[in-house]
Amino acid sequence: MRLDKSKEVFDNTKRYIPGGVNSPVRAFKNLSITPPVISKGKGCRIFDIDGNEYIDFVLSWGAMILGHCDPDVVNRMKEVVEDQIAFGAPTEIEYKMAKLVCETAQIDMVRFVNSGTEATMTAVRLAKGYTGKKKIVKFAGCYHGHHDIFLKEAGSAVAELRLKRIDEDIVQNTIVVEYNNLDSVEKAFKENKDEIAAVIIEPVAGNMGVVPAKKEFLQVLREICNLHGSLLIFDEVITGFRLSLKGARALYNVEPDLVTFGKIIGGGLPCGAVGGKKEIMECLAPQGNVFQAGTMSGNPIVMSAGYATIKKLKENPHFYSNLEMLAGKLEKELTQVFSNSNLTFCINRVGSMLTIFFGVEKVENFEMAKMSDLDLFRSFAEYMIKNHIYVPSSQFEAMFLSVAHSENDVEKFVEIAEEFCSSKRK
């Protein structure tokens, strides 16, 4: 696979953008190949400027659940862009989008922002304002955006690149505990009695690789928050509208006080949201005294893309059963391939998200994820990409499927994975 044009553009970009990218994981820093510079996406396929075609299992980090450039989403955006780009003023599509999100996700109220980071930052500020408390609990390996309060022992590219440039003064009120470990949570509450405003968690972690929370763990976490007058925040930036119309909450039957969204909610455009119980949400300005603002929040083009996406998901509930079938097939056949190759591994999957961990048999938290064979995963990722299967370059990210994927696409993934295993035996 040749990437001559991609290399030229990427090298030139480094003169004007730090590292040549606008988000670190895109740089393929831990691989020995140049990141393909993408020029086009259609369905489950993307194309680079060198003419290479890939089956995409990254999907803009999970955002493109309908596949790239879904016709209904594109047409809706075209209709809007002739008359509306940005106003910084109310528009009718904001109302329609808010109503659709609240009814579909079964929440009382929602506030739209421009990214997942803004959503989680707003949720924590809101929790502190509502409870009058200062501290938050987060889990090692969970990634809630790039604000300092969340980067303490975070997953995603922070872990892969071993980045530690955070303001210790800001994170002094951030308490980090172990995912799926109730003892560590109870200890945190005991040592910080009446000081914890909220617990924020990815109910299915996607940034230490895919690591699902245990059902009992989330249920007891809900009880602990109730007991101590703390809010429970589900970060569903990745899982919202991906695992179901109600996100991961439907899988666990646990209701948080606040939930954050991103990725899918914007239909591929920059968007985030925080939603939840009315009495809490009404604390946001201008109704309440917890400040949050954004000139581009509720942008009409973004709202239109998100509306078209969620509406299509709502009108086609079979999409989720099809995604479960395809992802289950991928998990089952990869398990057979790796088992036949006598590899030690585990595959964590929830719905249409999955991660392969080499060198370990079980991953339930960040410490376990870090014990996996990172070098072997890098070799695997590089081999897959060179052979036109686009996967995350980082162990601590998830792979995704879209409704545009077919059984043939899954079989091609498995075929290339089998070739990788054969190459390792030689």
From Swiss-Prot:
Residues of the signal peptide: none
Segments traversing the membrane: none
Main localization (coarse): cytoplasm
UniProt-annotated location(s): Cytoplasm
Keywords: Cytoplasm, Isomerase, Porphyrin biosynthesis, Pyridoxal phosphate
Presence of the UniProt keyword Nucleotide-binding in the record: no
Keyword Repeat: no
Name the UniProt record assigns to this protein: Glutamate-1-semialdehyde 2,1-aminomutase
Species of the source: Caldicellulosiruptor bescii (strain ATCC BAA-1888 / DSM 6725 / KCTC 15123 / Z-1320) (Anaerocellum thermophilum)
Biological classification of the source: Bacteria, Bacillati, Bacillota, Bacillota incertae sedis, Caldicellulosiruptorales
Gene: hemL
